[in-house]
Swiss-Prot record:
GO terms, molecular function: cell-cell adhesion mediator activity
Lineage: Eukaryota, Metazoa, Chordata, Craniata, Vertebrata
Protein's gene: cntn1a
InterPro entries in alphabetical order: FN3_dom, FN3_sf, Ig-like_dom, Ig-like_dom_sf, Ig-like_fold, Ig_I-set, Ig_sub, Ig_sub2
Highest rank taxon of the organism: Eukaryota
Protein name: Contactin-1a
Gene Ontology biological process: axon guidance; cell-cell adhesion
Length: 1032
């Protein structure tokens, strides 16, 4: 019997609505239920589309305004208010000339730091409520100029490190970038393993100063936030020459302090050391490992970059700097905190009037964020949850959940509506036709639109249905039928009623034959690389389409993506279908439980089979090392999976950590490691060497992947057995014995405190002199003794030592002590100027066989320091040389010394040279080019060149006559202001310049074209290469 309430009669519909809309997207009840809400339901509260952003305004900005953006989507359109530091801004016309609002955006004209810096928020409102934007901080940026005070020069010995201080001027914000200029703008110094600029302090660090570092340095500072750059006064860096560069241990000068960073950000840690040789820098995390794929090291180790920080990246980081003289370490703690981030946000919701509702939001962050709620822009409640009971119209409005910690504030916005409505199936009727398989299960859904929640009843035809062993009416109103048969076919009606009305909806049920698997897939056993086959046959209702779905261990096989290994065949007939799955070139990952599911639109059934895949073994586990000696270790491991084929043997491999070698098979005891073993001794190792080990298993089906490497292990120390090679030497300074060698490679140190013992003696002397060299990378030792006779034969041998003892001596080598420096000085016989910039000096050679060459030094008297003199080296076979690069009209002093490998002998007497005045600077002015009446010559004429007071007197003119495009031509000289030149066929250039005792002056050039035959050149004419290039 149909309930009385649902007999046909007039029905009253009453509707009252409140609504909740997310700020991130528009959600309108009226879009889904226009009949329920009518025209008014198209309205909704403000939803932010743009919010104001933090702004840094440059104090020197030419654009004298700041714009803060605020834009919402709302219906009706929202009105806008602005707050500064939580105080309402008066934005009426004429109230404050600095502020104006346009379409929600706040414009600040002629910004003033004292008035307009602070935190701004935008409030958007309409009839449905108000929402408040995130806070936007307005700050004023500046970067002052550097002080105009001169910077003091920095004097550093070559080989030592240097630090040039930047001392940036006052600025805001703190974020600056630094570079250094050398001598002039914009010559920025390149950064490399030896030079580093700290982006924290701006200081320039040079690990090892060289003579080429001499120059003037300026710190160049840029503020990206305000697009401004300034640079300091230049700092002179003066390297002080050392006869031999000393070595200095690594000394870390750039040390990143303990620092804080936010989750997801990138951070860079700095570390740079002074020292000679240039230190090597390495990084490690002391309480963990450097994050794989999220870290990078640059600038030869000076910078450690950590990307997309996670909380587990917090910890203690250490940089190590070392060279052959020593090591240094620095530790810094990195703390990772997080700005608020939503774990759960308030969501859109429609709630029945009088009902209960919980509005909840959860935020993560470090420190833990404080959470509170706003309603229509005002404080509503603290905590992460608001509980409503017996909702009423007064609960309507715009709600915001706000999470805040010291790193930021986030908002989640929503609009609340509560509604009341009679039941309606207009937009969600009962499914009109439902199919069910015999002996199966079906569910009719009944979900009318109604508030308060309606009472639900069901009928079949005119029969009212009740819960039984086969029939269930769920709490949500759905009707479930179990173990169905043909007698269950028919029409089913859902009735819904609440205090505002009633409604019903009807659907029909039809019964089909059940689907059955008649041939299930069979178990299979294959080896890796072989093929496997699974077959499945099913019967089904002829009126329904059947599909087969294959899955492996519960996961559907993607036949398109895995087409390399999976192929499927299907056959269909009336009421029966089959499917065959072919697995080609099987791999270990293909093993498992395969399921065939036969499925129609009404029902499905499944059958399964196991596929076993046998293959090479997996990697051994837990590789570790014990019983370490100087040349052996014991390696232990645990068996990995044998992949259903017994392990026959193990192979142990090793590599040296420092050498970054490829893995190689290790020599073991026993030589052949059986498949049931879990340890082996690795032999023939080098002492005091760091190794890694790994193990590989093999069975009859192949060799498996290697294990993870063992922890790095260093063998014990032992006495060295390798001596230095290529022992030689000789030469050097007087009264010295210079010994050279090729150092022992580091893998043969065999222990700490490695060095060399050198034994040497005159060839026929029975007494050996022994010295110790503690630098393992040293290649030379110079023994100084005033008693050493020159050019004497010495016998030398060497051996290595370490903390465990001394090694064997090398074979003896024979070298000679240094010869004496020349004892006599050359005698200068002539020193005279050739031009304004060149001179010649001639001397009487020193008649000693030990002279190898001569050094000529010259410098400007009373102007240049003798130490800065220009130097020319000349072979001992020469007794004269040409001096160039001299200054015109200047007094020079010149001296000559004989020298050899032992040094320089005494200087000759000093001679004076006075260079000529400069050649004429003005070129001749060519005034005419006239063809001779015969056509065989041409006359070139020019004005006389007058010398200036500081220039040499003109003695004549030089004329170069050459074919265009040729590097040489015919040179003429004349004292006149004109010259006749033979006319030749083709295009020619004529170059004219004045000549004086100071040299040749500036050139004038004219181009001529002739048609006469080109005569042969007279033998008396001189061919010269092209030297003049100036064209007037």
């Amino acid at each position: 019997m149909i309930p009385e309430a649902f007999q046909p009669r007039a029905m009253k519909h009453t509707t009252t609505v409140l609504m909740l809309a997310l700020s991130s997207r528009f959600w309108s009840v009226c879009a889904d239920f226009p009949e329920v809400y009518g025209g008014e339901s198209a309205g909704f509260g403000p939803v932010f589309e743009e919010q104001p952003l933090d702004t840094i305004y440059p104090e020197e900005s030419p654009e004298e305004k700041i714009t803060l953006t605020c834009r919402t989507r709302a219906n009706p359109p929202a009105s806008y208010r602005w707050r500064l530091n939580n105080a309402e801004l008066v934005l009426a016309e004429g109230s404050d000339p600095h502020y104006s609002v346009s379409e929600g955006n706040l414009l600040i004209s002629s910004p003033d730091k004292s008035k307009h810096a602070g935190n701004y928020t935008c409030v958007a409102s309409n009839q449905y409520g108000s929402v408040t934007s995130r806070r936007a901080r307005v700050q004023f940026g500046y970067l002052d100029m550097f002080s105009t005070d001169e910077r003091e020069a920095v004097y550093v010995k070559e080989g030592q490190g240097a630090v040039l201080l930047c001392a940036p001027p006052p600025h805001f914000p703190e974020d600056l970038s630094f570079r250094w200029m050398l001598n002039e703008f914009p010559e920025f110094i390149p950064l490399d393993q030896r030079r580093f600029v700290s982006q924290s302090t701006g200081n320039l660090y040079i690990s090892t100063v060289r003579s080429t570092d001499s120059g003037n340095y300026s710190c160049f500072v840029s503020s990206p936030a305000i697009a401004k750059s300034v640079f300091s006064k230049f700092i002179p860096l003066v390297p002080i020459a050392e006869r031999s560069l000393r070595k200095y241990p690594a000394d870390i000068k750039v040390k990143s302090p303990d620092s804080w960073a936010l989750l997801g950000q990138n951070v860079t840690l700095e570390c740079f050391a002074l020292g000679n040789p240039i230190p090597q820098i390495r990084w490690r995390k002391l309480d963990g490992v450097l994050p794989p794929l999220r870290h990078d090291v640059s600038m030869s180790g000076a910078l450690l970059h950590l990307y997309s920080l996670q909380y587990e990246d917090e910890g203690l980081y250490e940089c190590e700097a070392d060279n052959s003289k020593g090591k240094d370490w620095h530790k810094t703690h990195l703390y990772v905190e997080g700005a608020p981030d939503w774990l759960e946000q308030i969501s859109s919701s429609e709630v029945d009037i009088g009902g209960d509702y919980i509005m909840s939001c959860q935020a993560s962050g470090k420190p833990k964020p404080h959470v509170h709620f706003l309603k229509n822009g005002h404080m509503y409640m603290k905590g992460h949850e608001v509980r409503f009971s017996r909702l009423g119209f007064e609960d309507s409005g715009m709600y915001q959940c706000v999470a805040e910690n010291r790193h930021g504030v986030i908002h989640a916005n929503a609009e609340l509506r509560v509604f009341a409505s009679a039941p309606s199936f207009q937009y969600n009727p009962v499914k009109p036709k439902l199919l069910g398989a015999r002996n199966g299960r079906v569910v009719f859904e009944c979900r009318p639109r109604a508030a308060p929640r309606p009472n639900i009843t069901w009928s079949k035809g005119t029969e009212l249905l009740h819960n039984s062993s086969r029939i269930s009416i769920w709490l949500d109103g759905s009707l479930e039928l179990l173990n169905i048969s043909k007698s269950d076919e028919g029409k089913y009606t859902c009735f819904a009623e609440n205090d505002r009305g009633r409604a019903n909806s009807t659907g029909s049920l039809s019964i089909t034959d059940a689907t059955k698997i008649t041939l299930a897939p069979s178990n299979a056993d294959v080896s890796v690389g072989e093929d496997a086959r699974m077959e499945c046959v099913a019967s089904h209702d002829p009126g329904l389409d059947l599909t087969f779905i294959w899955s492996l261990d519960g996961h559907t096989i993607n036949l398109q993506r895995d087409a390399q290994h999976y192929q499927r065949k299907m056959d269909s007939a009336s009421g029966t279908s089959s499917s065959e799955l072919l697995i080609t070139h099987t791999q270990l990952r293909h093993a498992g439980r395969y399921s065939c599911t036969a499925q129609t639109p009404v029902d499905n059934t499944t059958a399964s089979a196991e596929l076993v895949v046998r293959g090479p073994p997996g990697p051994p586990g837990g590789v570790r090392v014990d019983e370490v000696t100087s040349d052996s270790v014991r390696v232990l491991w645990s068996h990995g999976t044998d992949n259903l084929s017994p392990i026959s043997r193990y192979t142990v491999q090793l590599r040296e950590s420092a050498a970054q070698q490829d893995w190689r098979d290790a020599a073991t005891s026993p030589v052949n490691v059986e498949g049931n073993a879990e340890m082996a001794t690795v032999v023939n190792l080098l002492p005091w060497t760091e190794y890694e080990f790994r193990v590989i298993a093999t069975n009859t089906l192949g060799t498996g992947p290697p294990s993870e490497p063992s922890p790095k292990t260093t063998t014990r120390e032992a006495r060295p057995i390798v001596a230095p090679s290529d022992i030689g030497g000789g030469g050097g300074t007087s009264r010295e014995l210079t010994i050279t060698w090729t150092p022992v490679q580091s893998q043969y140190y065999y222990g700490s405190n490695f060095g060399y013992i050198i034994a040497f003696k005159p060839h026929n002397d029975p007494e050996w002199l022994r010295v110790t060299v503690t630098d393992p990378e040293a290649q030379k030792y110079v023994h100084k003794d005033p008693k050493i006779p020159p050019s004497t034969r010495f016998e030398v041998k060497m051996k290595a030592f370490n903390s465990q003892g001394e090694g064997p001596f090398s074979n003896s080598a024979f070298i000679y002590s240094a010869q004496d420096v020349p004892a006599e000085a050359p005698i200068i016989t002539e020193a005279r100027a050739l031009s304004a910039t060149e001179a010649i000096v001639i001397w009487v050679p020193v008649q000693l066989p030990t002279v190898e060459r001569y050094q000529v030094r010259y410098w400007r008297e009373s102007v240049e320091n003798e130490a800065s003199a220009q130097r020319v080296l000349v072979s001992s076979r020469e007794n004269h040389t040409r001096l160039d690069n001299m200054k015109p009209d200047s007094h020079y002093l010149v001296e000559v010394r004989a020298c050899n490998g032992a040094g320089y002998g005494p200087a000759s007497q000093r001679n004076r040279i006075y260079t000529k005045k400069s050649p004429p600077s003005r070129p001749p002015k060519i005034i005419s080019t006239k063809m001779h009446y015969s056509g065989t010559s041409i006359n070139i004429a020019w004005e006389k060149v007058e010398s200036l007071n500081n220039e040499s007197t003109v003695a004549g003119y030089k004329v170069l006559y050459r074919q265009h495009g040729q590097p040489s031509g015919t040179l003429y000289t004349t004292e006149k202001q004109s010259i006749d030149l033979p006319m030749r066929r083709g295009e020619y250039l004529v170059e004219v310049r004045a000549h004086s005792e100071g040299g040749d002056g500036a050139v004038a050039q004219v181009r001529i074209t002739g048609s006469a035959p080109a005569p042969a050149l007279a033998s008396a004419l001189l061919l010269l290469p092209l030297l003049w290039t100036l064209m007037l």
